[in-house]
């Protein structure tokens, strides 16, 4: 009998979502974000595995969805089938600020235009989820792009292959993250 390699079944994320990436957001080296796009247009904003939060054994001290005095992502309320009432976000709209125990602060951005459906309030009390399960329970927010923009929303984003090429180049150049 011939030895067959056991193939691991794809995860739910890999099966139902397409991964897109935005690197060096706002010119900050290695501050990479990952956008998980479902076939129904919904996008889940997460941190890419190369983000500095995951480097050098950092620990998260605080996550704050209060963007400014008059704007808190926690106050976002949507209702109805078409999700009316959600805050509209541009590509560079801040979603939250994450402070690490070394006092380094990172602003997480939406990366795409669309309506904010929800933010992950669970990570406020369990910030370790962001480190342990960034693509599932440790997500940042869920955004719904406008229907007419749902195809163009990925323009300017990188595929998994393009992202891995950038990571390879960084490793060769030894760019500090």
Curated annotation (Swiss-Prot):
Parts of the chain that traverse the membrane: none
The record's listing under InterPro entries reads: Abitram, GCV_H/Fam206, Single_hybrid_motif
Gene3D superfamilies linked? 2.40.50.100
| Molecular-function GO terms, alphabetical | actin filament binding; actin monomer binding
Q: One GO cellular component from the entry? A: lamellipodium
Q: Give a Pfam family name.
A: GCV_H
Give the location in the cell. Nucleus speckle; Cell projection, Lamellipodium; Nucleus; Cell projection, Growth cone
What are the alphabetically sorted keywords of the record?
Answer: Cell projection, Nucleus
GO biological process assignments? dendrite morphogenesis; regulation of actin filament polymerization; regulation of filopodium assembly
Q: What does this protein do?
A: May regulate actin polymerization, filopodia dynamics and arborization of neurons.
What the record says about family reads: Belongs to the ABITRAM family.
Q: What is the protein named?
A: Protein Abitram
- Which species expresses this protein natively? Danio rerio
| Taxonomic lineage of the native organism | Eukaryota, Metazoa, Chordata, Craniata, Vertebrata
Q: Which gene encodes it?
A: abitram
């Amino acid at each position: 009998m011939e030895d067959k390699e056991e193939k691991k079944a794809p995860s739910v994320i890999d099966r139902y979502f397409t991964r897109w990436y935005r690197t060096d957001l706002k010119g900050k080296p290695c501050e990479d974000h990952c956008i998980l796009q479902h076939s129904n247009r919904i996008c889940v904003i997460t941190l890419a595995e190369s983000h500095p939060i995951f480097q050098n054994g950092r620990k998260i001290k605080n996550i704050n969805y209060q963007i400014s005095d008059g704007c808190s992502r926690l106050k976002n309320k949507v209702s109805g089938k078409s999700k009316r009432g959600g805050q509209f976000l541009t590509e560079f709209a801040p979603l939250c600020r994450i402070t690490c125990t070394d006092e380094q602060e990172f602003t997480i951005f939406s990366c795409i235009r669309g309506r904010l459906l929800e933010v992950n309030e669970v990570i406020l009390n369990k910030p370790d989820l962001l480190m342990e399960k960034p693509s599932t329970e440790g997500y940042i927010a869920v955004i719904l792009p406008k229907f007419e923009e749902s195809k163009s929303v990925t323009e300017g984003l990188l595929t998994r292959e393009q992202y891995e090429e950038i990571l390879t180049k960084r490793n060769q150049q030894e760019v500090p993250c």
